[in-house]
Amino acid sequence: MSSLGRLHLITDNRPGQDPLAVVRAALSVARAELVVQVRVTDETTDRQAYDLARRVTVLCARYGATCLVNDRLHVALAVGADGGHVGADDLPVGAARAVLGSAAVLGATAREADTAVEAVAAGASYLGVGSVHPTTSKDGLPPPIGAAGLRAVAAAVSVPVIAIGGVTAADVPDLRAAGAYGVAVIAALSHAADPARATAAFVEALTC
């Protein structure tokens, strides 16, 4: 999937955050190189998730960027997103593929080579692999897999591998060397004082 963007922005809609402002800033810099994954808190209603995903889908379309919806695949279908992403506790990859259809982009989360191979066989278009570093963006995660774990997964599959978990722009060269096609971030953009400038740093690192 050579057309998949290398920088994945996962939205943060927790109190005090403005996900649409961050998406706009990131799109203005990364344009079609950006993939926006609409992820919302468990407390977010489907209507709220729909409203956010619909607006993000429209923004992404203006730049030729990809919009995915995490977990809530019915929302992805309702807003006409490009696809979705499922984690370990979400729908099985095969079931998610059946829901979204053969043409959709479908991401899946993996930490180990065997589960990565299974996810690809079930229909995953790309894999989000990690957490590669410690992160505070999600509670209850297992220990980070590091560059060695990322390398093992990347060597086992032929689809793009997206490194996630505590990633900074400075980490990109080492992650690319370990086999990552791109990176996924939350705090590095959503909590940045200047999201556009932070996006530019990632784009530069990913295109070197």
Swiss-Prot record:
It comes from the Bacteria. Pathway: Cofactor biosynthesis; thiamine diphosphate biosynthesis; thiamine phosphate from 4-amino-2-methyl-5-diphosphomethylpyrimidine and 4-methyl-5-(2-phosphoethyl)-thiazole: step 1/1. It catalyses: 2-[(2R,5Z)-2-carboxy-4-methylthiazol-5(2H)-ylidene]ethyl phosphate + 4-amino-2-methyl-5-(diphosphooxymethyl)pyrimidine + 2 H(+) = thiamine phosphate + CO2 + diphosphate; 2-(2-carboxy-4-methylthiazol-5-yl)ethyl phosphate + 4-amino-2-methyl-5-(diphosphooxymethyl)pyrimidine + 2 H(+) = thiamine phosphate + CO2 + diphosphate; 4-methyl-5-(2-phosphooxyethyl)-thiazole + 4-amino-2-methyl-5-(diphosphooxymethyl)pyrimidine + H(+) = thiamine phosphate + diphosphate. Mg(2+) binds at D71, D90. 4-amino-2-methyl-5-(diphosphooxymethyl)pyrimidine binds at Q37, V38, R39, N70, T109, K138. Binds 1 Mg(2+) ion per subunit. One of its GO terms (cellular component) is cytoplasm. Transmembrane segments: none annotated. SUPFAM superfamilies: Thiamin phosphate synthase. The keyword Cell cycle does not apply. It is an enzyme of class 2 (transferase). One of its GO terms (biological process) is thiamine biosynthetic process. Gene3D superfamilies: Aldolase class I. It holds the Pfam family TMP-TENI. Its EC number is 2.5.1.3. The keyword Magnesium applies. Keywords: Magnesium, Metal-binding, Thiamine biosynthesis, Transferase. Belongs to the thiamine-phosphate synthase family. Condenses 4-methyl-5-(beta-hydroxyethyl)thiazole monophosphate (THZ-P) and 2-methyl-4-amino-5-hydroxymethyl pyrimidine pyrophosphate (HMP-PP) to form thiamine monophosphate (TMP). This is Thiamine-phosphate synthase. The gene is thiE.
